Regions:
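Two-component/phosphorelay signaling modules centered on CheY-like receiver
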Residues: 12-31, 118
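Acidic, metal-coordinating helix/loop segments flanking the phosphotransfer/catalytic sites
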Residues: 32-50, 71
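Acidic catalytic/metal-coordinating carboxylates
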Residues: 35-38, 61-67
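Active-site T/S-Asp motif of two-component receiver
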Residues: 53-54
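Receiver (REC) domain active-site loop signature in two-component systems and cognate sites
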Residues: 57
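Alpha4 helix (beta4-alpha4-beta5 surface) of REC/receiver domains from two-component response regulators
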Residues: 64, 85-100
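C-terminal output helix
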Residues: 106-115
Length: 124
């Protein structure tokens, strides 16, 4: 069984890095978006097992995306992959309902552990 994951980041390079890491873990059902607004539209159209999102993006930030997902009543795991590691910012995300976060640059092993924890599927 492969998880379906939504990857949201305004950097095409970072999306490729995240997707490559997911592929290395055996996750191949991946949908990508270049900002939170597009990510939210995709989220509304498709069921996802997890959402991986950057924080700082144009049009709609990852935090705004997270809040919109939670406001819709969804409990899908949302993992922020971000450079935002300052305590106040992390607390803001936790209060908004983030499942977890990874600080860029991240290791594939860290991503694997979080995916196993939240979506309960074995990843390589």
């Amino acid at each position: 069984m492969s998880a379906k994951v939504l990857v949201v980041d305004d950097s095409g390079t970072m999306r490729k890095i995240i997707i490559r890491s997911l592929n290395a873990l055996g996750v191949t059902d991946i949908v990508e978006a270049g900002d939170g607004s597009d990510g939210l539209e995709l989220f509304k159209q498709h069921p996802f097992d997890a959402v991986l999102t950057d924080w700082n993006m144009p049009r709609m930030t990852g935090l705004e995306l997270l809040k919109a997902i939670r406001a819709a009543g969804s409990t899908v795991p949302v993992i922020l992959i971000t450079t935002e590691a300052e305590k106040g910012r992390v607390l803001e995300a936790v209060q908004a309902g983030v499942s977890d976060y990874l600080v860029k640059p991240f290791e594939t092993e860290g991503l694997r552990k979080k995916l196993q924890k939240f979506i309960g599927v074995a990843v390589a």
